[in-house]
Amino acid sequence: MRLQPIFTLLAIFLPLSIFAQDFSGYWEGTNKFGKAYSIMTLDIQQTGMHLEGTGEQKSLDGKEYSKFTFNGVVDKDQVKIQCLAYSEKVGNWWCLPKLEFVYSKTETEERLDGKWKPNNVKNGCILISGKAALSRPIQKASPLPVASVVTPELKMDQQGEYLVNALKERKYYALIIGVSDYEDENIVDLDQPVHDAVNLRNVLSRYYTFEEENIIFLQNPDRSSIIEAFDRLSEEVTSTDQLLIFYAGHGIWDTKLEQGFWLPSNAKQSSKAQWISNGTIRDYIRAIDSKHTLLIADACFSGGILKERAAFMESRAMVELYKMPSRKAMTSGTLITVPDQSVFIEYLTKNLRENEYPVVTAGQIFNKFKIAVINNSANGQVPQYGVIHQADDEGGDFVFLRR
């Protein structure tokens, strides 16, 4: 009896059965050198356990970038990639790294978390390394075709068409803040905020009508940079525009003052001088003359800025909410600590990506993912949505317009 062919087949197929994940497709995220972040994308083609493809690194403002080719392998639960050569490069601070990732998966996305390190090729990185994190959304399964069933085309009523046409004439502004690294050694650095901020910016600019020139992106800003951004918005935003503000980083609740604070990168644990209070944030939101302002805060104790309020909807009601000014906040929790690895932002971006309607309110998006956050957070995290106190809210709601 000859067993050699059987053993040969086992040798070929056993590695695939141990780790059968298909990495083919588009991955997007960040890499970090010191305290500086850049955006990284990989377009992977997989054959067996071998990988190849093209990638890009670019600065957060998009002005400097490099494009490159790579190959790699899947080794058990690790993905190992070697960047080979540039196809295009603008700027002088790029180098070609080796990348090592560990794969993980959640309900909403697949992740590659790891590091980049020195690479012994022409233009390769030398004696430097840093963190890297990529992700891609888990695609919804396409429904099976059903014989003799005709799906009616989705049609908007006149109210919906009016709203879409009105929103097309408006500008959508965004201030997106991610603080991962702190100067004070007594304040623990965070892994995710800048990565999450980049992820949200990409979703807003790709799927909704937020143009790049109207997005202010702040990576590890100090207090003055945040205040200057608020000042700029107060000058540029008009009474017909929409404004979204996102903050991810440390938050602190002062029980004596009964006040919450954001911690910019230059905050000190021993002094509140560089902290930004909820009161200051509220005052700026009130001063910015937008039609609708939506504040999204993914930080500990972020719920202290608002009063919870129920949301509802249909086309006619949505038009009425659009007509009325609003100052709303969506937060990752109440007066509790929240984890660095954010389930909140994961489900927020998932629902923004998967929304197929031309217009959707912030309240509708929130109601779709609130229960998922509660059910999938380790500490019973309860996200909040409601009115920002004393900020001139008149009962409206922020309306997203899909491209």
Question: Which residues does each predicted region cover?
Answer:
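Intrinsically disordered/low-complexity terminal segments and short unstructured peptides
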Residues: 7, 105-107, 150
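Central antiparallel beta-sheet cores of small beta-barrel/beta-sandwich binding domains
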Residues: 21-137
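Cysteine endopeptidase catalytic domains of the caspase/legumain-like
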Residues: 133-403
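Short, charged low-complexity linear motifs
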Residues: 10-13, 97-99, 194
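Bacterial Sec-dependent N-terminal signal peptides
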Residues: 1-23
